[in-house]
Amino acid sequence: MVIGISYSQEIVVNEEMTAKHMGSGDLPVFATPSMIAIMENSSMKAVELHLATNETTVGGRIDVKHLKPTKIGETIMIKATLEEIAGKRLTFKVEAIVNGDIIGQGKHVRFIVNKTDFMNF
């Protein structure tokens, strides 16, 4: 695993991803919780092939700004780039981009854990 590895995915905003549907607002626009979930997923996917079979990553912190609204039907590219490795702590830069405009950005921290040990909480 090295600094700079990344994962990007494109999604098309649908009704289930809206603030109105999720209950985080009352307008049919891309919801902040949806953006965060996809940012976390992109971060997970960026490193999953670099882990042992008995390891995974779990989210520990997220600090993002949702800068602009996005309508149903618009395509969003969400990218996570690994910026720092500190033992089992991984820090990612996360971005959401629509037509070249950043609509969301921030940092996400994940931790490498042993799957079995983690589930024995």
Regions of interest found by a model, annotated:
Residues 44-76:
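Hydrophobic beta-strand-centered segment that forms part of the acyl-chain substrate-binding groove
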Residues 13, 70, 105, 109:
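Long, contiguous binding/interaction regions
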Residues 2-7, 83-92, 99-119:
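C-terminal binding/interaction regions
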Residues 32-36:
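Conserved N-terminal beta-strand and adjoining loop/helix that marks the start
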Residues 1-30:
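Catalytic strand-loop segment that frames the active site of acyl-thioester-processing enzymes
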